[in-house]
């Protein structure tokens, strides 16, 4: 469920503002999206894992709040981010 160090480095290299950037909203949203995708795959096989389902809903809410913040601060960054992550089909 959690991200390995290699996965985090790869995500941060792709979405962070610089190499060691972990705090920018883009980096946080990208890491949350990876965790959400992994949890969604887990829940497809373990349908009755309600504890993990609640965790998934919390992650989705956190990502939604971060995306709302990015949209409020800079719409161009928001549109670029959702396009790169493949959100909002």
From Swiss-Prot:
Q: Which NCBIfam families match?
A: S15_bact
Output the lineage of the source organism.
Bacteria, Bacillati, Actinomycetota, Actinomycetes, Mycobacteriales
A GO CC term attached to the entry: cytosolic small ribosomal subunit
Q: What does this protein do?
A: One of the primary rRNA binding proteins, it binds directly to 16S rRNA where it helps nucleate assembly of the platform of the 30S subunit by binding and bridging several RNA helices of the 16S rRNA.
Gene name, Swiss-Prot/TrEMBL? rpsO
PANTHER family in alphabetical order = RIBOSOMAL PROTEIN S15, BACTERIAL AND ORGANELLAR (PTHR23321), SMALL RIBOSOMAL SUBUNIT PROTEIN US15M (PTHR23321:SF26)
GO-annotated biological processes: translation
In this record, what's one Pfam family? Answer: Ribosomal_S15
Q: Name one GO molecular function term.
A: rRNA binding
Subunit field text = Part of the 30S ribosomal subunit. Forms a bridge to the 50S subunit in the 70S ribosome, contacting the 23S rRNA.
**How is this protein named in the record?**
Small ribosomal subunit protein uS15
PROSITE patterns xref list: RIBOSOMAL_S15
- InterPro entries, per the entry: Ribosomal_uS15, Ribosomal_uS15_bac-type, uS15_NS1_RNA-bd_sf
Q: Which residues form a coiled coil?
A: none
Q: Which UniProt keywords apply?
A: Ribonucleoprotein, Ribosomal protein, RNA-binding, rRNA-binding
Family note: Belongs to the universal ribosomal protein uS15 family.
């Amino acid at each position: 469920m959690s991200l390995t160090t290699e996965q985090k480095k790869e995500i941060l290299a792709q979405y962070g503002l610089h190499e060691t950037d972990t705090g920018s909203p883009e980096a946080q949203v990208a890491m949350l999206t990876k965790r959400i995708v992994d949890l969604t795959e887990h829940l497809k096989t373990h349908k009755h894992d309600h504890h993990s389902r609640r965790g998934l809903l919390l992650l989705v809410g956190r990502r939604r709040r971060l995306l709302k913040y990015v949209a409020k601060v800079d719409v161009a960054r928001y549109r670029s981010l959702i396009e790169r992550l493949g959100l909002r089909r």
